[in-house]
Regions:
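Residues that line or immediately flank small-molecule/substrate-binding pockets and catalytic motifs
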Residues: 8, 69, 104
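Thiol-based oxidoreductase modules, predominantly thioredoxin-like and allied folds used
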Residues: 59-85, 94
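Bacterial Sec-dependent N-terminal signal peptides
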Residues: 1-25
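Non-catalytic, surface beta->alpha helical segment in thiol-disulfide oxidoreductase systems
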Residues: 92-119
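Short, solvent-exposed loop/turn and secondary-structure capping segments
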Residues: 44-48, 75-78, 111-114
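Alpha-helical scaffolding within the catalytic cores
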Residues: 48-49, 83-87
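Local sequence-structure signature of Cys/Sec-based thiol-disulfide redox active-site neighborhoods
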Residues: 22-69
Length: 119
């Protein structure tokens, strides 16, 4: 009987010590914004303005990556395309630019007007 009680007490102590206290206060987090763009894209400069505005609003917390690929980014000089960027555009079936993923949390890329409201 004593052994069973000691065993249960030991298991309970292990379970209680395994709990991690988590705060309920709002925490700052970093944001990763992938912007798909092209040098012949009409609206892409406005997308860059929006992305830079978000980065200025949260200095040191927003990381921007521009991926030049697709029909708006021909392989003429200066060629900003990469094989990885082209593969990402094809895999995500992106046809309108600028498009972006915020922290890669959505299944589909969203337009520049939705970047600041995305989780």
């Amino acid at each position: 009987m004593k052994r069973a009680f000691a065993f249960i007490l030991m298991i309970t102590a292990l379970q209680l010590s395994a709990q991690q206290i988590v705060t309920t206060e709002v925490q700052n987090r970093n944001v990763f914004l992938e912007e798909y763009t092209g040098k012949h894209c009409t609206w892409c400069p406005e997308g860059q303005v929006v992305a830079n505005g978000i980065a200025r609003s949260f200095p040191g917390r927003v990381f921007l990556v521009n991926i030049h690929a697709g029909s708006f980014s021909p392989a003429s000089f200066p060629n900003l395309n990469t094989d990885d960027g082209t593969a990402m555009v094809e895999a995500n079936q992106l046809y309108s630019f600028p498009a972006g993923y915020v922290n890669r949390t959505s299944e589909y890329a969203v337009g520049r007007e939705q970047w600041s409201s995305n989780p």
